[in-house]
């Protein structure tokens, strides 16, 4: 199978290279908390030798409730990201929700993310593509893995070939998600070998059909992440928090940050083992 390499500065992401970590917090809750969380991730990933990109949202524009916390907004968010980059020398990924935000965000961060709910919005895709930034495409829960090829084609037609794909599960009936482990290879194939990242945090989400906030299955994060890493992928997407019960968004799915190092040790061991095996051509 062909493996494309996407360069995030000096970090190389590919399905046959050591895995890259996209990790941080769901949404920027405060400057100080972002600094604490980023410092912890940087310390652990440097210790373990894992290439790392800090993740947070400056605006959660798709919250279920009008009363839910959204974030500090574009201007303050970019200030915080700039400070994190200066303080820790870290790469940053964040999501873009409107075409008019794309260039302003790409001027600051290293990877811009296309949200799952917006992944078929052509105007947004084209605006993001024109920035020339590395793109992380969240596969929508409501499309099959094979359909991501159409999204990748839009970016390429707009002149951007630096595309990473990210799976966060698929709808399984109402208010539930499952992860199709066979889908990772389908995404690789239909994209011509794009790096595939597994967003284990959001794959753990559950919904109360009458509630305003997401639930989660944090207790199953290790099992699900181990299964995904065993397929052989380019990276893992994991959010952590020092106090998940009081996180302002998706706390029930967040990894307690004190568990980050032992968690990543397991992921690194699986990744190294799987990628030490030769690829077997078993036909089509």
From Swiss-Prot:
Pathway(s) this gene product operates in, as recorded in its UniProt entry: Carbohydrate biosynthesis; 3-deoxy-D-manno-octulosonate biosynthesis; 3-deoxy-D-manno-octulosonate from D-ribulose 5-phosphate: step 2/3; Bacterial outer membrane biogenesis; lipopolysaccharide biosynthesis
Protein name: 2-dehydro-3-deoxyphosphooctonate aldolase
PANTHER family hit by this protein: PHOSPHO-2-DEHYDRO-3-DEOXYHEPTONATE ALDOLASE (PTHR21057)
HAMAP family the record matches: KDO8P_synth (MF_00056)
Organism taxonomic ancestry: Bacteria, Pseudomonadati, Pseudomonadota, Gammaproteobacteria, Enterobacterales
Gene Ontology MF annotations: 3-deoxy-8-phosphooctulonate synthase activity
Enzyme class of the recorded protein, top EC level: transferase
Keyword Cytoplasm: yes
Family indicated by similarity: Belongs to the KdsA family.
Transmembrane segments: none
């Amino acid at each position: 199978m062909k493996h494309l390499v996407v360069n995030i500065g000096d970090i190389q992401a590919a399905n046959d290279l050591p895995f890259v970590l996209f990790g941080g917090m769901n949404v920027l809750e405060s400057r100080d908390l972002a600094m604490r969380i980023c410092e912890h991730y940087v310390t652990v990933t440097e210790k373990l030798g894992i290439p790392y990109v800090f993740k947070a949202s400056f605006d959660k524009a798709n919250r279920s409730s009008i009363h839910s916390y959204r974030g500090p907004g574009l201007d303050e968010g970019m200030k915080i990201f700039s400070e994190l980059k200066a303080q820790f020398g870290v790469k940053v990924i964040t999501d873009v929700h409107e075409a008019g935000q794309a260039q302003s965000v790409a001027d600051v961060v290293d990877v811009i993310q296309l949200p799952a709910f917006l992944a078929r919005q052509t105007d947004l895709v084209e605006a993001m593509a024109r920035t020339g930034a590395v793109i992380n495409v969240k596969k929508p829960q409501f499309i099959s893995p094979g359909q991501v090829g159409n999204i990748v084609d839009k970016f390429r037609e707009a002149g951007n070939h630096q595309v990473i794909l990210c799976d966060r599960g698929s709808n399984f009936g109402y208010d539930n998600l499952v992860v199709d482990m066979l889908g990772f290879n389908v995404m690789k194939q239909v994209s011509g070998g794009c790096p595939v990242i597994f967003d284990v945090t959001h794959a753990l989400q559950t919904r109360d059909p009458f509630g305003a906030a997401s639930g989660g299955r944090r207790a199953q994060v290790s099992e699900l992440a181990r299964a995904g890493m065993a397929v052989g992928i380019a990276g893992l997407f994991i959010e952590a928090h020092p106090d998940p019960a009081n996180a302002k968004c998706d706390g029930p799915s967040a990894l307690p940050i004190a568990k980050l190092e032992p968690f990543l040790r397991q992921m690194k061991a699986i990744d190294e083992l799987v990628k030490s095996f030769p690829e077997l051509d078993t036909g089509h």
